Amino acid sequence: MSSLYYANALFSKYPASSSVFATGAFPEQTSCAFASNPQRQGYGAGSGASFAASMQGLYPGGGGMAGQSAAGVYAAGYGLEPSSFNMHCAPFEQNLSGVCPGDSAKAAGAKEQRDSDLAAESNFRIYPWMRSSGTDRKRGRQTYTRYQTLELEKEFHYNRYLTRRRRIEIAHALCLTERQIKIWFQNRRMKWKKENKTAGPGTTAQDRAEAEEEEEE
């Protein structure tokens, strides 16, 4: 009896609390009815209307805001239009449409092929026995500059045959090798002999003696 008395006294102390919520705001439903209510199963037009009615019952002065949509509420609060919510998606979609997936795949394949070729070249080693050292190997023709040709012509004018010491000096002065100097003088002597075929046999013997002396040195 004492507990029931205190409970009745407690509930009777707040008689106006039931008038805070409207009668139709939160209708009492059984557990089965709550599960089978189609308005509770989704966010349809009926659920929005009941929610707006309940909001009007709770906040009489805020009925205008309860009837607005979520985009309208955010637009009114931040000064944005509803169409601005999807603006960030447009450039991204345009970029995706402009990129061809086949190009990226081809670029990736070409890069992998190039990397594999470079790795193979770096691992490949050429040994001396792999290089051709026979007479069939062609040598590139040496080209002389105008200054080098002029100096060689001057030297040939005074000496058609060079000693080894003089050949080394000319090679260092003209930035050439001894072999290049020797080949140039041989070719120049052949040209000079063709130009002077009418020379006597004494001159030929003298040239042969000078050539033998050059080979010995």
UniProtKB/Swiss-Prot annotation:
Region spans: Disordered: 193-217
GO molecular function annotations of the record: DNA-binding transcription activator activity, RNA polymerase II-specific; DNA-binding transcription factor activity, RNA polymerase II-specific; RNA polymerase II cis-regulatory region sequence-specific DNA binding
Record carries keyword Transcription: yes
Gene, per the UniProt record: HOXB7
Organism: Gorilla gorilla gorilla
GO BP: anterior/posterior pattern specification; embryonic skeletal system morphogenesis; myeloid cell differentiation; positive regulation of branching involved in ureteric bud morphogenesis; regulation of transcription by RNA polymerase II
Major location category of this protein: nucleus
Domain of life: Eukaryota
InterPro entries assigned to the protein according to its UniProt record, in alphabetical order: Antp_homeobox (IPR050296), HD (IPR001356), HD_metazoa (IPR020479), Homeobox_antennapedia (IPR017995), Homeobox_Antennapedia_CS (IPR001827), Homeobox_CS (IPR017970), Homeodomain-like_sf (IPR009057)
GO cellular component, one term: nucleus
DNA-binding region, residue intervals: 137-196
Stated name of the protein: Homeobox protein Hox-B7
PROSITE patterns in UniProt: ANTENNAPEDIA, HOMEOBOX_1, HOMEOBOX_2
Family: Belongs to the Antp homeobox family.
Subunit structure: Forms a DNA-binding heterodimer with transcription factor PBX1.
